[in-house]
A protein has these predicted regions:
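Active-site-proximal loop->helix
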Residues: 150-158, 164-222, 307-313, 425-426
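Active-site/ligand-binding-proximal alpha/beta "capping" segment
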Residues: 219-289, 375-381
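Catalytic phosphate/nucleotide-handling subdomain of diverse soluble enzymes
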Residues: 398-426
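N-terminal juxtadomain amphipathic helix
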Residues: 1-78
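Active-site/ligand-binding loops adjacent to catalytic centers
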Residues: 199, 207-234, 288-388
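Short glycine/serine/threonine-rich phosphate/pyrophosphate-binding segments
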Residues: 126-132, 157-175, 188-192, 243, ...
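A short, small-residue-rich loop immediately preceding and capping a beta-strand
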Residues: 142-184, 265-278, 295, 413-417
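Positively charged, low-complexity intrinsically disordered leader regions
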Residues: 56-145
Length: 426
């Protein structure tokens, strides 16, 4: 966003080269082509959309054949399935008839639900992380890594106590790569137990009196990266390769609508936002289809830094000027409250700029929901669809509930049930 360009052939570049500890507000963005989106019928989205993925372009730019690149995806998928019980597959995206009826939509309109609960590690998070892993494995296979033996691999690192951590541990275990997970003292015991079963190194991160505002887990994570760990994270500001695989969600949704749904295109897309990576990746995926719905980013009133930033941006010249006014628009939420949708309580929306830009350019906007709406959305979503989604997973639906009175009955809207409920494991 500062104008710095990084060649797609460059290995092991995670952040903008101009980002420093004193000037961290830089973010690399993937440059998408304008070629019409055409996928194969392969069940694995990373094969079906392979030519559009940045990691694939990285391999090609360094002389790796198409067959070798495809083989790498397939072998990695086998390894992942050996740990997770499933590999990557195109996930369901269909009109939820009972939910649509409950919300008063006509037959021409309605709610389409993208169900990520049966994906690798139970959420969308592995989509983002697998393109980081493919970049690493490609770098190794081409002899471009500074290490020559698997035993000398630097540790992967992530700051998370939820689905992202579980996905990271699953993928790391599949390729036997060491992983350090930075978690808060109040981390969910179910998640911690799962991480230990996957041999992750868990680092508890209490707040230190002397440290600046922001998430202590992020501070410890960044310290680890500064000493050689690889950022294996779902924040594009820390590792831009996570934005690559996340686009497959938008590509799948756009392709399904084009090939299987008769009538007008999707009007709106409601996406729950913590770090912002899901929303940024999904809407960028839609852009390549040529049809982009209005984006509504959903946060809870317990923690809504994106909503605040969206309002601030309008006073500094709009999204195009946002990067130059980063500190004026986005800073850590001062008092993070509690919510059943605890997976979107990031005190900063790290990938906020592409989300704000998409909402502004597409005439969408942020929505802040109450805890009552978070709970209602989960009850309604589970009851009408039968999908075992968590409160975080259905938080986008809470945004739809909040905005329902302003939406015409014949509009077509979509939500993403992004993660499975692990409540039964407690």
């Amino acid at each position: 966003m500062c104008g710095t360009h990084v060649d797609i052939a460059a290995p092991l570049v995670w952040r903008c080269p101009r980002a420093t500890d004193s000037d961290p507000h830089h973010a690399l963005q993937l440059v998408q082509g304008t070629t019409p989106l055409r996928a194969t019928d392969d069940a694995n989205p990373f094969v079906a959309f392979q030519p559009y993925l940045a990691w694939d372009s990285f391999g090609a730019a360094n002389g790796m054949t198409e067959a070798a690149r495809t083989s790498m995806i397939r072998q990695l998928d086998i390894d992942i399935a050996g740990v997770a019980g499933t590999g990557f597959h195109v996930t369901p995206f269909d009109r939820a008839d009972s939910l649509s009826e409950a919300l008063g939509f006509t037959e021409d309109g309605g709610v389409w639900v993208k169900d990520e609960t049966d994906n690798v590690a139970g959420s969308h998070k592995a989509r983002h992380l697998v393109t980081i892993l493919l970049h690493l494995l490609t770098t190794e296979s081409l002899g471009l890594a500074p290490w020559t033996d698997e035993a000398d691999r630097p540790a992967l690192a992530i700051a998370s106590c939820g689905n992202a951590a579980f996905a990271a541990a699953t993928l790391a275990a599949a390729v036997k790569w060491p992983l350090r997970v930075f978690v808060p003292p109040h981390a969910d015991p179910v998640v911690i137990a799962g991480l230990r079963q996957l041999d992750a190194d868990i680092v508890e991160c209490p707040r230190r009196d002397s440290e600046p505002a922001g998430d202590p887990c992020i501070h410890r994570f960044r310290e680890a990266v500064a000493t050689g760990a690889i950022p294996f994270t779902v924040q594009g500001t820390e590792n831009m390769w996570c934005l690559d695989g996340g686009r497959t969600i938008g590509w799948e949704m756009a392709r399904h609508l084009e090939e299987n749904v008769v009538g007008p295109p999707l009007d709106r897309l409601f996406v729950q936002v913590g770090a912002g990576t899901l929303a940024a990746s999904t809407i960028n995926g839609f852009r390549m289809s040529g049809v982009t719905p209005r984006l509504h980013a959903v946060q809870t009133d317990s923690c809504a830094p994106l909503d605040r930033a969206y309002a601030k941006v309008q006073g500094v010249g709009g999204p195009k000027a946002a990067a130059a006014h980063w500190s004026e628009c986005m800073w850590p939420w001062e008092h993070v409250g509690n919510s059943a949708a605890d997976g979107i309580l990031d005190d900063e929306t790290y990938d906020w700029i592409p989300v704000v830009r998409a909402m502004t350019e597409g005439n969408g906007g942020p929505i802040v929901v109450t805890e009552a709406q978070v709970l209602e959305a989960n009850d309604l979503g589970r009851a009408t669809t039968g999908i075992n989604a968590s409160h975080t997973g259905t938080a986008g639906l809470a945004g739809l509930l909040a905005a329902r009175d302003s939406i015409d009955n014949d509009e077509r809207v979509a939500v993403i049930f992004s993660g499975v409920s692990r409540a039964a494991l407690r």
